[in-house]
């Protein structure tokens, strides 16, 4: 699907700068009442398929496809004696479906020929535009010859029709891309969706719209690991305004899309992130292999199309690097792993997106072996249309707190949990300067309801990495609400922080940005972000209102001697040579993975945003600013830390 090119004027860019202060909200699509945050039953997908003359890492041709998955292992009715076939997700859902001679994936030949067969008495009809075949679609008669320019391809969706023209059984989807596998570098994600459905999502990017689609995912070595029908939604907050969208793909169960001919497996089964191991429960220590949904993110404020401020600095690297740094040095904070994915939409190259974990209730369920019905997630949201009425310029309302608020699931129990969280933070903020007796009383209450070590690590990491889109925004907390379980620490019922949108970090914005408060250079004193509204002498410019009460929680906790000592120790660890070397390693790894594919990404989107990075050399220069930050940050951070600690001496 071709997107209209729209060059953004400078005035519009400044407006977008206000919008991009946070990519967290603006829509119910990414809130706790998201229907994607359901509890699909566990299911399995077919073992990785291979076939035809697709290229494997060793240069050989793939083996014959494996038989469909045992129905007992899926969320589907049994079909007697389902034949071996290349039916996409491998599920013997229906007795009648077309068989492809070649499995979708990457190919290097100049052309590929695909034959499709059907059981006797049935006609095959197919489409190449991503839509579901109908009785008016092209009838298959001869082999389909696929010729595509390098990096492009063709999506074929086929189905069987009976003598009355009725679609029977599963729609089978295979996408063929003219490209070679680059082992270890990135996933390949091929999405197929009706063009009208895509237009409906793009027409109102903030509407709560989900459409049926098909997802094929290839491992970095080119092996086809996923092929199944999914729910497709736009994802993110203000970054939805960018030409390249972020998507959420959801492993829906059978019947979710009503009478439409889609098959739901309920789970994506593959270890997408080998670093991710289950933390507790019966699968503790094992690599996580089941996901209910996945995110394909455009990078938010670090997207190359995010040009409203400092358009020569985005890289698509920051969020992933920051989260992995937190995984090692703030291990009690729930974070999101990510890998680069080259994405195709209906066979057309769509550029690079980050394939990420979706940090919802299902994420907690998978990590800790608990019931997701006993997990509540509360997130801050951003709505730039909310105004206080006291400012002539609505953009100034960001400072009075009108824009920022908490959201969670609409159910009464979740709403009560959210109110309890707000009340706890508000009580702490109100006790920053309380008498010692009153402070100790309230600290004991906070300590009984909040994982103190988790909060300490979360705040230290955000300050070190210079996340200036926080703590007034981009907050995610969660709590287990069920009965305690032996051996599972998080069932103590305490609130815990998780990362959210770490793209606003590590030298993304310079001092000369249109909005001075978003500066993220290595010299920034981020302690002012959590102290300026509560401690005299911090913050010499207009500062965000503490509408979410997290700014007050920090000085409240810092008043405790033990917390302050542990916080200082972790901060010095973050600024240590060892941590600095690790952060440098993370940067170099991400750079090495992105650079070989960044040129095509830039070519795909160049011209869609005013001032966007136009070539690989410019991107390399932007990426080097992260390296500059990593080198300069430790000394600056320790200086600010010592200044802050001196207040408590």
Residue positions per predicted region:
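Bacterial N-terminal signal peptides that target proteins for export
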Residues: 3-15
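Gram-negative bacterial Sec-dependent N-terminal signal peptides
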Residues: 14-22
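C-terminal motif of bacterial Sec signal peptides marking the signal peptidase cleavage site
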Residues: 25-28
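Bacterial signal peptide processing site
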Residues: 30-32
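Short, compositionally stereotyped local motifs that mark structural "simplifiers"
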Residues: 39, 62-72, 76, 80-232, ...
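Juxtamembrane proline-rich low-complexity "stalk" or linker regions positioned immediately after a signal peptide
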Residues: 41-68
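Middle-to-C-terminal accessory/interaction subdomains
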Residues: 187, 196-204, 214, 238, ...
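Conserved ATP-binding subdomain of kinase catalytic cores across diverse folds
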Residues: 207-397
């Amino acid at each position: 699907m071709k997107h209209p090119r729209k060059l953004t004027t400078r005035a519009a860019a400044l407006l977008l700068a206000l919008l991009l202060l946070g990519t967290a909200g603006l829509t119910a699509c990414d809130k706790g009442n998201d229907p994607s945050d359901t509890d699909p039953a566990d299911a399995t997908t077919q073992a990785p398929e291979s076939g035809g003359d697709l290229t494997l890492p060793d240069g050989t041709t793939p083996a014959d496809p494996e038989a469909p998955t045992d129905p007992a292992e899926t969320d589907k009715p049994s079909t007697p004696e389902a034949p071996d076939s290349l039916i996409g997700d491998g599920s013997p859902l229906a007795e009648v479906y077309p068989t492809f001679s070649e499995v979708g994936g990457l190919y290097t030949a100049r052309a590929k020929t695909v034959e499709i067969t059907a059981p006797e008495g049935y006609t095959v009809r197919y489409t190449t535009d991503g839509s579901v075949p109908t009785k008016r679609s092209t009838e298959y008669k001869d082999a389909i010859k696929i010729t595509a320019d390098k990096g492009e391809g063709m999506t074929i969706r086929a189905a069987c029709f009976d003598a009355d023209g009725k679609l029977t059984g599963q729609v089978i989807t295979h996408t063929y891309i003219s490209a070679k596998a680059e082992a270890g570098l990135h996933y390949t994600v091929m999405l197929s969706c009706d063009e009208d459905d895509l237009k409906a999502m793009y027409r109102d990017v903030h509407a709560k719209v989900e459409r049926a689609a098909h997802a094929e995912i290839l491992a970095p070595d080119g092996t086809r690991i996923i092929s199944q029908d999914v729910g497709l939604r736009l994802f993110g907050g203000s970054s939805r305004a960018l030409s390249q969208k972020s998507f959420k793909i959801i492993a829906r169960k059978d019947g979710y899309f009503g009478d439409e001919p889609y098959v739901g497996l309920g789970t994506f089964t593959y270890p997408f992130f080998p670093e991710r191991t289950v933390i507790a429960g019966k699968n503790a220590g094992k690599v996580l292999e089941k996901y209910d949904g996945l995110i394909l993110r455009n990078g938010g404020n670090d997207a190359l199309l995010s040009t409203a401020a400092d358009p020569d600095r985005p890289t698509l690297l920051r969020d992933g690097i920051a989260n992995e740094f937190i995984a090692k040095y703030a291990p009690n904070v729930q974070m999101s792993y990510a890998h680069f994915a080259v994405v195709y939409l209906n066979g057309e190259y769509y550029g690079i997106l980050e394939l990420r974990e979706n940090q919802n209730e299902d994420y907690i369920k998978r990590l800790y072996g608990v019931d997701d019905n006993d997990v509540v997630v509360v997130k801050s949201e951003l709505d730039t249309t909310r105004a206080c009425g006291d400012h002539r310029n609505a953009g100034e309302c960001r400072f009075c707190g009108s824009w920022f608020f908490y959201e969670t699931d609409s159910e009464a129990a979740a709403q009560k949990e959210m109110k309890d969280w707000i009340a706890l933070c508000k009580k702490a903020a109100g006790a920053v300067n309380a008498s010692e007796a009153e402070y100790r009383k309230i600290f004991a209450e906070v300590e009984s309801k909040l994982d103190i070590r988790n909060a300490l690590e979360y705040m230290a990491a955000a300050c070190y990495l210079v996340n200036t889109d926080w703590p007034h925004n981009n907050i995610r907390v969660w709590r287990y609400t069920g009965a305690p379980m032996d051996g599972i620490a998080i069932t103590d019922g305490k609130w815990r922080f998780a990362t959210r949108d770490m793209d606003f970090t590590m030298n993304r914005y310079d001092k000369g940005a249109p909005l001075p408060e978003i500066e993220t250079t290595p010299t920034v004193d981020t302690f002012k972000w959590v102290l300026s509204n509560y401690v005299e002498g911090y913050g010499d410019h207009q500062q965000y209102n503490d509408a979410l009460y997290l700014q007050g929680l920090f000085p409240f906790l810092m008043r405790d001697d033990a917390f302050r000592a542990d916080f200082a120790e972790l901060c010095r660890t973050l600024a240590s040579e060892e941590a600095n070397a690790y952060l440098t390693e993370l940067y170099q790894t991400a750079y090495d993975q992105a650079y070989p594919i960044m040129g095509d990404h830039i070519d795909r989107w160049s011209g869609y945003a005013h001032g966007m990075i136009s070539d690989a050399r410019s991107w390399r220069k932007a990426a080097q600013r992260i390296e500059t930050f990593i080198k300069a940050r430790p000394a600056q951070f320790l200086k600010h830390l010592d200044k802050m600690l001196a207040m408590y001496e």
